[in-house]
Regions:
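Short hinge/gating elements
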Residues: 3-6, 61-65, 164, 190-194
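Glycine-rich phosphate-binding P-loop
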Residues: 4-21
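Divalent-cation
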Residues: 92
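N-terminal targeting leaders
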Residues: 101, 119-123, 148-159, 164, ...
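Conserved nucleotide-binding/hydrolysis micro-motifs of P-loop NTPases
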Residues: 95-96, 112-117, 169-171
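ATP-dependent small-molecule kinase phosphotransfer cores
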Residues: 35-87, 127
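Conserved phosphate-donor/acceptor-positioning beta-strand/loop module used by diverse small-molecule
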Residues: 101-124, 132, 136
């Protein structure tokens, strides 16, 4: 059992490579369309928010909105839920950050020269060179800004990936073969200990998402994470700031219900008015 995450530059050919590897390995292929559809299952409102915020750099105002924070939390919970299923190719969505340190996950970035990216877009989308260049610049700026805001890192920094491939210097067939082999090498790393790390991360993300999207939970700051990475017996920690003291009990009850037998601790503080607190998604 293994996982492949692919971050790609727009027009690099990364999407085709991801599909090809998924087909060769008979892995599930999870892309933007599937994740947005899953988020929409939380309600039509969240489906609309997903379309509004997806892969775009939010404005200074938007980044503090309840809807943006809820969208990010839902997106991360869905990615980790798919990762639990194994045998999956996850396209983008910050999967490389969410699965950092998971030994049976192979995290790659695919890039290409500007000239090759423009050529692909002119052929695929029927754009002229000027419009293709403009679109690439816009997408790079929006996606790069969104990733930096959420994860605090540059999305094209090689240190956040196991491998970086360049379709301008390597043939797609060679990249596909290499990626396939590397994914298969990681199957043996799917140990019980490694799986517990992923399970606890996924549980924390599920709790965070459930709290984040509930409009009756007046949260101005939120941090939900494993208390000790991979150690289920220590459970998860929920920290936050609320501006309605009566909501604390409901938040705690919701988290406990999701966690079941897994321990959960709380550090929820009350402040009498809402503040622009920090939400931890990294």
């Amino acid at each position: 059992m293994a996982i492949l995450t692919i971050s790609r530059r727009y027009g690099s050919g990364g999407r085709d490579i991801g599909r090809a590897v998924a087909d060769l390995l008979h892995y599930d292929y999870v892309d933007r369309r599937r994740i947005l559809a899953d988020i929409g299952k939380a309600g039509q409102t969240w489906g609309d928010f997903a379309k509004q915020y997806d892969e775009k750099q939010p404005s200074v105002y938007e980044r503090y909105k309840w809807s943006f924070r809820g969208f990010v939390a839902l997106n991360q919970a869905q990615i980790l839920e798919y990762a639990l299923y194994d045998n999956v190719v996850i396209m983008g969505r910050g999967g490389n950050f969410l699965l950092r340190g998971i030994p049976f996950a192979f995290r790659i970035h695919i890039k290409a020269s500007m000239e090759d990216r423009i050529e692909r877009l002119t052929k695929r989308e029927g754009l002229d060179e000027e419009n293709a260049r403009w679109l690439i610049g816009k997408v790079d700026k929006e996606m790069g800004g969104a990733v930096y805001l959420i994860y605090g890192s540059a999305w094209d920094d090689p240190k956040h990936y196991d491998r970086v491939f360049d379709t301008s210097t390597q043939k797609a067939e060679e990249i596909i073969a290499t990626v396939k082999d590397e994914v298969l090498k990681r199957v043996s790393a799917d140990t019980e200990k490694a799986r517990q790390v992923l399970q606890l991360r996924a549980l924390a993300a599920k709790v965070r998402a459930r709290i984040a999207i509930e409009p009756t939970f007046p949260i101005s700051a939120l941090d939900v994470r494993p208390k000790e990475e991979g150690l289920i017996q220590y459970g998860i920690m929920v920290r936050g700031v609320v501006y309605n003291k009566s909501a604390i009990g409901a938040i705690e009850e919701t988290a406990k219900k999701i966690c079941g037998d897994v321990p959960v601790e709380f550090e929820l503080q009350y402040r009498w008015h809402p503040r622009l607190g920090e939400w931890h998604f990294r």
